[in-house]
Amino acid sequence: MAAPAPRPLVIDTHWLLDLWLFHDPRAQALDTALAEGQVRWLACAAMRDELARVLDYPALQRAREARGLGADAVLARFDQHACLQPHPPASPWRCRDPDDQVFIDLAWAHQAHLLSRDRAVLALAAGMGRSGLLVSADWPARPSS
């Protein structure tokens, strides 16, 4: 019997920073899941562009320098693990933060679990959940409400 296909997952920028810049222990299980192919992380070019942009924020530049980590190393991890998708069509939900909209739209387009620590995204979790989408701030997933 074939192994089940890894479940699709959309990961926001906050989580990526916790994974690869801050090495937050709460992100360790996700890092393992990505490395072992337990999830299929879906992303698009706009998400990579946002990560590149925020890595250049002064506070994050200092954090990278303190860890001896270049932006290119973080972006290489993105490129290694992300399954790039075309830019998604608009979903039924509108996020207060336009930078976060693409994460919602991609999750909707692929019926993927959306992993986010962003308040504007999490504020939409209940409505998205009623449409069958799992939105959570935690990994392993616990639905946000």
Q: Where is each model-derived feature located?
A:
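Residues at secondary-structure transition points
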Residues: 25, 42, 69, 94-101
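Residues that scaffold the ATP/ADP-binding catalytic core of kinase and kinase-like folds
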Residues: 19-20, 54, 63, 124-125
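Acidic, PIN/NYN-like endoribonuclease modules and their adjacent C-terminal/linker elements
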Residues: 97, 101-104, 108-115, 119-145
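Glycine-rich, phosphate-binding/catalytic loops in enzymes
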Residues: 26-29, 59, 131-133
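Short, flexible loop segments at the rims of nucleotide/cofactor-binding pockets, characterized by
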Residues: 17-20, 64, 89-96
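PIN-domain endoribonuclease scaffold, especially VapC-family toxins
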Residues: 32-90
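Short, well-structured N-terminal submotif of metal-dependent ribonuclease cores
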Residues: 1-43
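Alpha-helix capping/helix-boundary segments
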Residues: 15-16, 47, 120-121
